[in-house]
Every structure is written in C-alpha cells, then in structure tokens.
Amino acid sequence: QVNGYFEASIRMNANPGHTGNMSIRGKDDKVVPYIIALWEGTGEDYLAPWARYLDDKGQHDLRSTESGKKILKGGEPSKKFNTYGILWTEKGFTWFVNGKQIHKVDRIAIAAPMTLQFTHRIGEWERPKLVLKNLPDDIDIDWVKVWK
C-alpha cells in the first residue's frame, strides 16, 4: 500500500550477534527512488529506528540521534512486548515505540507501494558477537496492525 501506519507488538531478541527487525520496503531496490524504513533490535536492549534511501545520487542512511541507544528501560525490549510503529505519509516517515515518537524523516518522495516485513537474521558483521549457547533467542510477534 502507499502511505499508512504500520504497527506491531514485538518482543525483540535479548543477545547480540543477530538482529530482529520490522520494516516497510519497496518492491525493487534497483528502481530509484527507493526506501526501507526499519525498527531494529540488535540485542542487549539496543534499538535502532532508521531508514536507507536510494536515489540517483547514491545511498543515504537516515539515522536518528537515538539510533543504536537504549531507548527503553533495561530489559524491556527483550523481556516484554512493546508496540513499534512506523507512520508513512506524503511528507515523510515517523517512528514510534509504545506511542512515543522517537524519530522523524521529512520530505522523502516515495509514491510506490511498499510491503511490511519482519525478519530475524545474522549478518556477517554480527557473527563474531553470536554466542551459540544463548540460542534460541527469537523475536516474538504478538499482533500486527496496518492502517491506510
């Protein structure tokens, strides 16, 4: 869909070495302009609201000053469900956690439909921090809501 509010109740992973995320993304990252807007949980209570924008000038990471910090109290991201939201309007993107605005990006011209995606991955850059005895360390999704 084009524009809307995307929200989910998520318990993020507790340990580093892998990442859980909620994202809205375009269909084809080879067609510009393209954007992916994400909530990422990287373990140890670190959360990152951010976006990656591609245009004819290249790739631009749009990170908040809160990105990669402990936005919630210790243990909250991995021990309980929290509500993560991304609002997409014709004026830009806004990230929320438990109803509180955390990050905002204005004036990104994207008018193509995007999809909502949840992933749990281990990137090559994360692998050195992965401790196998801490697995399983899943992300859990309680519910998902999408508004136009």
Please provide the spans of the model-predicted regions.
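GH16 jelly-roll
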Residues: Q1-K148
